[in-house]
């Protein structure tokens, strides 16, 4: 459990016991609080739910795994589910940290099953230098910091993949089609993008719901900041979709190149088969089984057998080298 008490955007106390949270809010009527729970049990969340009036369906979503990113409205609070992500490389599976948040009037309660890097969130709140943003100091200020950290991680992951696309393109557009290892690399990138898209795609709508004209969830002074996060979420999704379209086009181009190579090989083999078929047909039709050196001799049989094996082996290695086998 991690706790913080904020007054006008500044920390007044932190890392105090959960039992002292309510007292701190009573002592400072204008303060808001952050409560962070790592891998809480159902009993832990039931206690928090009873203290802060959290809806049972929201508690159920917080305990479940792999919930889609969303923002749900309940009579006394909001429930938000988002994913902070990181991508070590374009071919590796993205690392996703699922974060659930209960947003009450004076307390932001975050729940996550993976330790992740919560320090990024606290650092984001602590380094805020904009006076208008910091002095607003409400729950919308804390939620803005959470959204900003999450969307920044998603945009950074999208940029990592986008920057690696040139090398993937160069590797896949070789003459004759990409080698199997490069093709598998392309499939790995597509899988990474698909997984990343599931985490990023709903974020623009999640942030936009906070800015609905019919709601008073965000202070007017904070609306430009939320719109900035919304814009970053849109750009992250556009980057992912652009990379996904690009890698799909590369895989399609590679498949077309392989088809062209196969057609060329088939044409050459058909041409050689036609050339060989003419003398074979004529000699077969006229029954021209002529004596050859060593005919009816033991050494002649050995010689012809060796010739067949050598010629067949040479043809096999030639075709193997050309990539036809």
Where do the protein language model's features map onto the residues?
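Peripheral, non-transmembrane regulatory/ligand-interaction domains of membrane transport proteins
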Residues: 1-219, 225-228, 232-242, 324-325
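Hydrophobic alpha-helical transmembrane segments and their immediately adjacent juxtamembrane loops
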Residues: 53, 231-325
């Amino acid at each position: 459990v991690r706790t913080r008490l904020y007054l006008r955007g500044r920390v007044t106390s932190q890392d105090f016991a959960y039992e002292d949270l309510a007292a701190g809010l009573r002592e400072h009527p204008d303060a808001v609080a952050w409560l962070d729970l790592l891998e809480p049990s159902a009993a832990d969340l039931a206690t928090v739910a009873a203290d802060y009036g959290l809806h049972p369906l929201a508690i159920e979503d917080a305990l479940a795994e792999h919930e889609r990113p969303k923002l749900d409205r309940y009579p006394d609070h909001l429930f938000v589910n988002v994913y902070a992500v990181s991508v070590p490389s374009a071919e590796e599976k993205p690392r996703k940290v699922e974060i659930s948040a209960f947003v009450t009037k004076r307390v932001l309660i975050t729940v996550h099953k993976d330790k992740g890097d919560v320090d990024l969130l606290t650092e984001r709140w602590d380094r805020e230098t904009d006076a208008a943003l910091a002095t607003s100091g409400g729950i919308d200020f804390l939620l803005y910091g959470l959204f900003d950290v999450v969307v920044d991680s998603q945009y950074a992951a999208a940029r990592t993949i986008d920057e690696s696309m040139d090398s993937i393109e160069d590797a896949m557009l070789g003459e004759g089609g990409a080698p199997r290892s490069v093709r598998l690399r392309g499939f790995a990138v597509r899988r990474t993008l698909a997984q990343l898209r599931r985490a990023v795609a709903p974020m623009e709508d999640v942030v936009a719901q906070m800015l609905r004209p019919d709601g008073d969830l965000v202070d007017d002074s904070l609306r430009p900041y939320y719109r900035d996060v919304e814009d970053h979420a849109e750009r992250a999704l556009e980057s992912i979709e652009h990379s996904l379209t690009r890698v799909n086009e590369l895989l399609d181009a590679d498949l077309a190149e392989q088809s062209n190579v196969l057609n060329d090989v088939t044409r050459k083999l058909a041409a050689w088969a036609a050339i060989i078929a003419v003398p074979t047909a004529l000699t077969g039709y006229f029954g021209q089984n002529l004596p050859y050196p060593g005919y009816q001799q033991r050494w002649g049989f050995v010689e012809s057998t060796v010739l067949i094996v050598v010629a067949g082996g040479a043809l096999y290695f030639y075709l193997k080298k050309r990539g036809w086998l």
